[in-house]
Amino acid sequence: LCRRDARPLGPGVEVSGKFWRNTMIPTRKTDEKFYRLFSTFHAFSEHLTKREDNELRDKYDHNAFCYSGQPTDDELRAALAYQKARGDAFLKLEGYEPLANAFGMECEETVTMVLPKGTDISGWKANPEVSIRTPDFDQLEQHELKYYGPLYGEDFTVRNNRHLREKLTYLGAYLGGKLAGDCYIFASDGYVCMDSLLVDEAFRHQYIATTLVKHIAEKAQERGAVLYLHADPEDTPKDMYAKMGFQAVDKLYEYLCTDFSKLKI
């Protein structure tokens, strides 16, 4: 999936160099509009643009430096000094090509997968006993605390969820009167992004995820919109999405540092 070569990302899912050269990637525009719901953007240096969410300054994605090319050592030093001056104990860089010099930071990748228009979704498995509706927000918070609390801390998990749901549409999958799964969606410019899909482990193997995705896909197709999502290329859900017909069209490279002493500059 890198621009330099074609890499398979699942059964029948491959993006060629020709694709990159000849196709604009409209999901990037929708993703930028998503971030602008929460963050301001300002040019920082020749290769860096700073994204800032002053209501949730400890959320890495909302406060990253977006690079358009390889940052120089001086640019990274300036970015580091800027973060320190703000009192932000992290530095995140992200862009659509891998960095030749990552300054000692490890890279994580996120794949954008699109469901092509006209995809037949009638055969997707769904649980007829699952109802899809706006989740009860207390239940939603408890659901996210169960899984994200141990990873990110309870305080951040609650603040993050409340911040996001101010401007995003959350959908809950209910089975037996209980919240079994949830996700949020954002629509713009004929595209619908589905993200943060979370299924309670007590309801695994009951088609909660596919029922949610099918519901969203049906609504998108009714509107003539294109559904897409973001996936970790190493996780099992990516393979499930590929089997459902989603195709990989883009990849984001993300570099994070939370220990400035490890930076190589």
Name every feature range the model reports, one short phrase each.
Residues 2, 12, 17-23, 68-131, ...:
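Acyl-donor-binding surface of acyltransferase catalytic domains
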Residues 15, 20-86, 153-154, 158:
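N-terminal charged segments
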Residues 24-38, 60-67, 111, 121-157, ...:
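Short amphipathic alpha-helix that is part of the acyltransferase structural core
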Residues 59-69, 190-201:
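Conserved acetyl-CoA binding element of GNAT-fold acetyltransferases
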Residues 73-79, 199, 205-218, 243:
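Conserved acetyl-CoA-binding loop-helix of GNAT-fold acetyltransferases
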Residues 85-94, 220-232:
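Conserved GNAT acetyl-CoA-binding A-motif
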Residues 96-106, 210, 233-251:
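Conserved active-site alpha-helix within GNAT-family acetyltransferase domains
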Residues 154-198:
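A conserved beta-strand-loop-helix scaffold within acyl/acetyltransferase catalytic domains
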